[in-house]
């Protein structure tokens, strides 16, 4: 895990000139160990709660529908830069968000400050009071 984090971070920094502090576990799969190690290495594990399904090459219309239906403040929408219809769907999605009064912001502005913990659904919570029912092995696998 540490090696993969470092390799990816080094690559991003070599391209952008900026260090990374956030990462999305591949396929959304993670457990307490991944979160612990990422934090020890200075990273915050980020999940999403709205999947555009762009990776399945669904139509732009279906993507727009998925990303605008039941959207809420603080939602994180997953997109991929190589999806087939993202260039057609994204302007419509962003226009919808703007009309609905939402602002698209960097994830770094969504994160809670201070000690936090992440529940089984990938939602960040303040650590005070600390979670009382942690099993020590919380994990999540995204099912599509």
Where would I find each of the regions flagged by the language model?
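Active-site-proximal beta-strand/loop segments in catalytic clefts of secreted hydrolases
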Residues: 24-28, 48-51, 79-83, 107-110
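C-terminal domain-boundary segment and adjacent tail
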Residues: 85-144
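Residues at or immediately flanking beta-strands
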Residues: 19-22, 103
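Alpha-helical scaffold elements lining the catalytic groove of polysaccharide deacetylases
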Residues: 1-19, 29-75, 86-89
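Periplasmic/luminal catalytic loop of GT-C fold multi-pass membrane glycosyltransferases
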Residues: 77-78, 97
């Amino acid at each position: 895990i540490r090696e993969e984090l470092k390799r990816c971070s080094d690559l991003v920094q070599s391209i952008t000139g900026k260090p990374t502090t956030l990462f999305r576990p591949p396929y959304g799969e993670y457990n307490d160990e991944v979160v612990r190690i990422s934090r020890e290495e200075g990273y915050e594990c980020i999940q999403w709660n709205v999947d555009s399904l762009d990776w399945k090459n669904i139509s732009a219309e279906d993507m727009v529908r998925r990303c605008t239906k039941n959207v809420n403040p603080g939602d994180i929408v997953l997109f991929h830069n190589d999806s087939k219809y993202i260039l057609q769907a994204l302007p419509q999605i962003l226009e919808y968000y703007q009309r609905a009064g939402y602002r698209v912001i960097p994830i770094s502005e969504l994160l809670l400050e201070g000690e936090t913990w992440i529940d089984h659904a990938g939602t960040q919570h303040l650590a005070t009071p600390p979670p009382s029912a942690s099993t020590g092995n919380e994990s999540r696998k995204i099912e599509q």
